[in-house]
Amino acid sequence: MRKASPTVITHNKIPHPFIVKISVLDSLIILLYFIGIIGLGLWISRRQAKGGREFFLAGGTMKWPFIGASLFATNISSQQFVGQAGLAFAVGIIAGGFQLVGAFCFILLSAFFIRTYMGLRLATSPEFFEKRYSGRCRVVVSFINLMMIILGNIAAALYAGALVLTHLLGWDQLPNAEFLYWIAIFLIGIAAGTYTLMGGLKAVIYCDFVQMVVLVLGGALLLYFGIMELGGIESVFVGNVDDAGRSMWSLLRPWEHAFGWLPMLTGGLILGVHGHCTDQDYIQRALSAGSLYHA
C-alpha cells in the first residue's frame, strides 16, 4: 500500500478545502444528544431538594471526580475546540501555553483560594469583596464579572458552538444562512439554559461529566482523523513552520512576541489567577464540594 507523502504546512496556509457532510443519522445523533442532556438535567432536578444552597451549590454534596470533570469541561469547551485550535494553527503550539498556566492556577485554587472561600462560607466570589471591603465594592465587582461573562465567556461559547453546528448541518451553505446561524445560537442557549435553570448546579455538574467524556473521546478521534487527513504523523512535525521559518512546535518564543515567554509568565499568570481562582464558573463548582478534601 502506497504511503501518503507528508503535507508541508506553512503559516496561514490551509492544504486544501475541508468540507464536512453529515448524514441523516449524524443529524439524529446530534438531536438525541441535545435531548439526552436536557433530559438528564430535568431528571436530576426532580430528585434534589429545593432551596438556595441546593440550587447554587448543589447542597454541598458533590465529590471530587464530578467536580474535577466539571472543571475540565468548563475549561475545555467549544471555545478551545474552535478558537484555540485556530489560534494554534496561526501561531503554533505556544497557543496552548495559557492552558499550562491555567493548570498551575487550578493548583493555586485548590491549595490556597478555596480554603479561604470555604472558611468564609461564600457562595460567590464577589461576596469576598463585601466581607473584606464593603457592599458597594461587591456590587461593582459583580457588575464587572457579569459583563465579562455575558460579553466574553457566554458570547464566545455560543458563537463557537453555533459555528460548528451550522457547518455540520450544512446550514452555512443555504441562502438564509445568517438566520439559521441565529437559530443555532438559540438552540444551544435553550439546551444549556433549560437544565441549568431547572436542575441548578448539580444538574450542570452531572451534565458536565457526560460532556467531558464526549469532549475527550471526540477530541481524540478528531486528532486521529486530522493527522490521517494530513498524510500521517510526519506531516505534523516535518516542515511545520511559520512565516519566519520558526517551528510551530516551539514553546520558546522571543520575549517581544505576543506569545513570548515574558507575556506568558506575566500577563498569562495574571489572567490565569483571575480566570481560574476568582471566576464564578470555577469557584462555584469547587464550593459545591462536601468537604475541603473533595474541593
Indicate residue ranges for each PLM-predicted region.
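N-terminal amphipathic/basic-hydrophobic helices that include classical n-h-c signal peptides
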Residues: 1-19
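Loop-to-helix junctions at membrane interfaces in multi-pass transport proteins
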Residues: 19-23, 57-66, 83-97, 130, ...
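Structural signature of transmembrane alpha-helix termini at the membrane-water interface
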Residues: 28, 35-46, 107-115, 154-158, ...
